[in-house]
Regions:
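Bacterial Sec-dependent N-terminal signal peptides
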Residues: 1-22
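Zn2+-dependent metallopeptidase catalytic domains
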Residues: 17-248
């Protein structure tokens, strides 16, 4: 009897874990027209697990590229690198679009939390010496005429090679360590700066008491300013913020 109960409990836990995985919409391709995000299924609690799983997935994909015993080629190095990070790309595309256009306190807090984590992940890729050597090898192959690439393939190779060089892949270990510290600090300060600007923009109010000062403005702009003033408890006046009016 005890064995049966243990088995049932184990099955329940496994099913719950599987259900939890299936419930996160970022873990699989969006099953929508054109692959657009299905915002009816996306919730705040989905983002952080998706970021972490995306990092884990891409780390494994990068390791597979580096551990490949075959000589570096465009397909097994550049294409493989370009295709890595599917989950991370999906969650990043949605998350950062929202933090730029429709953020809130919860998204802002998560953005601050994930910034140094994502910065470290990026450095782990572009400062990975074994991966850089493979990319540089393919770049050298094309430079010496050993391989012929299409215009699109050349562009992709050039993009990644320059990304590694410009990210510090050629620096010595000491300078790379310092670069990691700088990148981590910049990721945090950059978000703090953006938040300060957003807060100042949201707080700004220009209250207009004399309608003559609105001369020349379209009626729909005046109406919008009057509505904003009313909502702010300043009925009978006009309020101009830094938000955009919807054009009807």
């Amino acid at each position: 009897m005890k064995r049966l109960l243990f088995t049932l409990a184990t099955c329940c836990v496994m099913c719950a874990c599987e259900q939890k995985t299936e419930m996160n919409p970022f873990f699989t391709e969006f099953q929508t027209e054109y692959g657009a995000p299905d915002f009816t299924k996306i919730r705040l609690e989905h983002y952080e697990p998706a970021f972490l799983k995306g990092i884990e997935e891409q780390n494994a994909e990068i390791k597979a590229i580096v551990d490949n015993p075959e000589e570096p080629t465009f397909e097994n190095t550049i294409v493989a690198l370009d295709k890595s990070g599917g989950i991370l790309a999906r969650v990043s595309g949605v998350f950062f679009a929202l933090t730029e256009a429709d953020t809130n306190d919860s998204l802002t807090a998560l953005n601050e939390k994930m910034a140094p984590v994502l910065s470290e992940h990026s450095d782990n890729i572009y400062l990975n010496q074994d991966l850089y050597k493979r990319v540089a090898d393919v770049h050298q192959q094309e430079k010496e005429g050993k391989i012929t690439l299409t215009t699109e393939q050349h562009r992709l190779l050039d993009k990644y090679y320059k990304a590694f060089v410009r990210s510090g892949a050629g620096l010595d270990a000491g300078k790379q360590s310092r670069l990691r510290e700088i990148n981590k600090e910049l990721s945090t300060l950059g978000i703090a700066f953006d938040n300060h600007i957003l807060n100042e923009n949201n707080a700004y109010q220009l209250v207009i008491e004399n309608e003559a000062d609105l001369a020349g403005l379209p009626e729909w702009v005046k109406a919008g300013a009057a509505e904003e003033a009313k909502a702010a408890g300043k009925e009978g006046k006009w309020l101009q913020s830094l938000a955009f009016f919807a054009i009807c």
